Amino acid sequence: VEKHGINSHLRQKGKIAELALGYGGSIGALKSMGALDMGLTEDDLQPLVDAWRMSNPFITKFWWDIDRAVKSTITQRIQNEVRGINFMYKSGMLFIRLPSGRLLSYVKPKIGENKFGGESVTYEGIGATKKWERIESYGPKFVENIVQAVSRDILCYAMRTLSHCFIVGHVHDELII
């Protein structure tokens, strides 16, 4: 979809679908991002979720590969690797080693049951209420954490590479020079 082309009116809908569905979101995520306010109906939402997932098989496979790696690392206390991302359990912590070598850390992870009756991972951290609590997660959410962290690492690399420039600031993934 071209930004100012014939079908540019579809751009915002596509952007919402990417942001809502890219990390495992479904109908609820689409609604919370304003899909119904953009003219989509309730009946449009599940087919949109299904179509997005069918159109992005490598992303959805990556979600569940990460999910399996996290769960087996926690339950079997073994190291795992998925596409250059390493998972290890040590001293009551789940560590995810990024390609940069930086570690993401999850405190006291364990396997529990989610609200849908399926298996999920929980760990301790600061939740939405700003209090220390158990936080539920799963493959797509871990992928979101990994992608955001790798993006930060790339931005930092770019900032070091451009150290000869006067960097005024940065917003999301853009540097202001």
Language-model features: where?
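Conserved catalytic core of nucleotide polymerization and phosphodiester-bond processing enzymes
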Residues: V1-I177
